[in-house]
């Protein structure tokens, strides 16, 4: 899937590919309920309906025990399930916030939740707060990891099984 033009960031098909997934995907049937893992408030509820985009997307703001802000993104939702969400709306842990969308409304993907965490919102001219890359270029791993940490623990998952091992040149 990362061979599609939407994931090309460089001048040719052999460089500059966004092939490193930056979130966790949880596969379930379309229509499955999506629940908030933590308290927070809505920053954006959008329909990014381009092919291979998020479809329905929900960005929420949170803060850790020290008051440091961070953000979470739910992608590939049914846009109708988040239509009533308003910016600033409080959401409590355990509350149903959306349902998964079918491929026809979720960017063309098999139904699943894309869950991602970020330490800051996009702030580049021409972007919006919901304009998160779901995949990054492996050459930018350190940068991507600093902005988009592994969200496994927020879902009650151990982070270790979700990190790919480094493959040596000899093995390749």
Predicted regions and their residues:
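Histidine-centered active-site/metal-ligand motif
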Residues: 21, 62, 76, 112-114
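Short beta-strand micro-motifs in enzyme catalytic cores
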Residues: 24, 56-58, 111-113
């Amino acid at each position: 899937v990362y061979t599609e033009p939407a994931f090309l960031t460089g001048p040719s098909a052999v460089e500059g590919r966004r092939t490193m997934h930056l979130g966790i995907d949880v596969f379930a049937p379309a229509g499955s309920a999506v629940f908030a893992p933590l308290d927070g408030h809505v920053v954006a509820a959008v329909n990014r309906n381009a092919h291979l985009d998020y479809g329905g997307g929900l960005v929420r703001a949170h803060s850790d025990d020290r008051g440091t802000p961070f953000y979470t993104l739910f992608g590939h939702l049914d846009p109708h399930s988040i239509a009533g969400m308003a910016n600033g709306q409080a959401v409590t842990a355990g509350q149903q916030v959306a349902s998964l969308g079918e491929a026809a409304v979720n960017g063309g993907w098999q139904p699943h939740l894309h869950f991602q965490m970020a330490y800051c919102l996009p702030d580049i001219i021409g972007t919006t707060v919901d304009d998160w890359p779901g995949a990054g270029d492996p050459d930018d791993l350190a940068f991507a990891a600093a902005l988009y940490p592994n969200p496994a623990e927020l879902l009650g998952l151990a982070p270790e099984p979700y990190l790919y091992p480094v493959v040596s040149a000899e093995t390749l």
